[in-house]
């Protein structure tokens, strides 16, 4: 067995049996078949002269196939005087003990520890007296030698070290327990924080309230598997519909044309002064041509339709000149009555025929101006034919009358062409010309 292995075995054995290592010996090399009596007989011849001793225990060492004995010596025995080897049964028996130089190193470390703690050897002795009151009886007795005194001192120091070690361990255990409690508190606080985060807040309550208010809408969206449309898209759709309504409003407002009432009241005035009518029609047509929007074209059609209707509303409110001339000739009144009973499509058909035959302009212009104007022009021409020269005021008036139908010709032509096939079989223009010749 090696020396290091023997020393480790000595330390462990002393610690296990709670024996002071400074008074313990380890004897190795004892044969396995050697008994207790033979072991004591061999040790008695070597250790008896040095002082008292006793065999504490024996152990079998498997590696060496030998026995080892733990021996405790008395307090006055000097370990340095014990031989390290002596003869025995089966060979040489070896002795292992702690080296005194190791004790010196231990004392040095102990002095440093006492200086760091602010203690002295007197304090150590006082503590030993408190722990072991029996030692106070032998306090005044001088020790037999310095080795015994040193052993007592070392025993006291070892006890102090054990007490301090126990105190340090208790403090470490208390600190470890506090750290464990702190970790438990931190884990509990973390778990509580997670629970607080998982609890529903105001947003969940508002969402549940909205869902409770409109459950059908939510169910419908869930059944269709489509998310609800965003509010921005709905606002855009509403704005588009409003824009469409704004575009449609001018078209609807342009249909009820209010100005034709004034045109109806002054229809004969327009017939008498056709140049003014041509100027107004040109003034109306120029902004219509300048505008490019489709809604303005519809306004132009709306302007033309009431003009066509106004030509038929004229006979209901005849001017003063027409009433004065209607009283004198009888044929004129008959023609007025005939004109009053005629329907608007016939007059439009006459306008269409007049647009087709531009050669006899005088006959066509009389027919296209309505019943009242036709009678007035024909009666005046009958009175003034034999007397009036070519370059008189009548010729100017006829020229102005010729200009008026030309200004109104496109509007009436469009209306007559749309209803032209209905007016062809009637043949009203020829009758009118025959009647004028008879008169």
Swiss-Prot record:
Residues 403-419 have a biased composition (Polar residues). Residues 213-439 are annotated as: Disordered. Residues 423-439 have a biased composition (Basic and acidic residues). Residues 231-249 have a biased composition (Basic residues). InterPro entries: PNM8A_C, PNMA, PNMA_N. Belongs to the PNMA family. This is Paraneoplastic antigen-like protein 8A. The lineage of its organism: Eukaryota, Metazoa, Chordata, Craniata, Vertebrata.
């Amino acid at each position: 067995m090696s020396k290091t292995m023997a020393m480790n075995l000595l330390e462990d054995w002393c610690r296990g049996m709670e024996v002071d290592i400074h008074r313990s010996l380890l004897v190795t090399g004892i044969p396995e078949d050697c008994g207790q009596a033979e072991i004591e007989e061999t040790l008695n011849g070597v250790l008896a002269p040095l002082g008292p001793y006793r065999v504490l225990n024996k152990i079998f060492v498997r590696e060496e196939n030998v026995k080892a004995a733990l021996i405790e010596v008395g307090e006055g025995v000097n370990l340095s005087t014990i031989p390290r080897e002596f003869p025995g049964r089966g060979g040489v028996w070896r002795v292992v003990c702690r080296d005194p130089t190791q004790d010196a190193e231990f004392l040095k470390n102990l002095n440093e520890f006492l200086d760091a703690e602010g203690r002295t050897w007197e304090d150590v002795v006082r503590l030993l007296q408190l722990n072991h009151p029996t030692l106070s009886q032998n306090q005044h007795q001088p020790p037999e030698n310095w080795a015994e005194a040193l052993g007592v001192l070392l025993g006291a120091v070892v006890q102090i070290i054990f007490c301090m070690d126990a105190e340090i361990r208790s403090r470490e255990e208390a600190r470890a327990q506090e750290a464990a409690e702190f970790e438990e508190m931190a884990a509990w606080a973390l778990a509580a924080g997670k629970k607080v985060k998982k609890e529903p807040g105001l947003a969940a309550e508002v969402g549940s309230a909205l869902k409770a208010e409109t459950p059908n809408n939510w169910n419908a969206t869930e059944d269709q598997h489509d998310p609800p449309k965003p509010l921005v898209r709905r606002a855009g759709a509403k704005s588009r519909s409003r824009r469409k309504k704004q575009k449609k409003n001018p078209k609807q407002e342009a249909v009820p044309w209010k100005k034709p009432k004034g045109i109806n009241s002054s229809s004969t005035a327009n017939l008498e002064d056709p140049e003014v009518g041509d100027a107004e029609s040109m003034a109306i047509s120029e902004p219509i041509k300048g505008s490019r929007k489709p809604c303005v074209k519809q306004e132009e059609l709306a302007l033309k339709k009431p003009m066509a209707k106004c030509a038929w509303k004229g006979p209901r409110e005849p001017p003063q000149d027409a009433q004065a001339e209607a009283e004198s000739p009888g044929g004129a009144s008959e023609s007025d009555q005939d004109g009053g009973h005629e329907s608007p499509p016939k007059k439009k058909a006459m306008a269409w025929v007049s647009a087709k035959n531009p050669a006899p302009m005088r006959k066509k212009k009389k027919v296209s101006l309505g019943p009242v104007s036709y009678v007035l022009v024909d009666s005046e021409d009958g009175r003034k034919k034999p007397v009036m020269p070519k370059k008189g005021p009548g010729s100017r008036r006829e020229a102005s009358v010729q200009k008026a139908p030309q200004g109104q010709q496109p509007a009436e032509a469009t209306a007559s062409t749309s209803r032209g096939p209905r007016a062809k079989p009637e043949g009203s223009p020829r009758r009118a010309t025959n009647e004028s010749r008879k008169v």
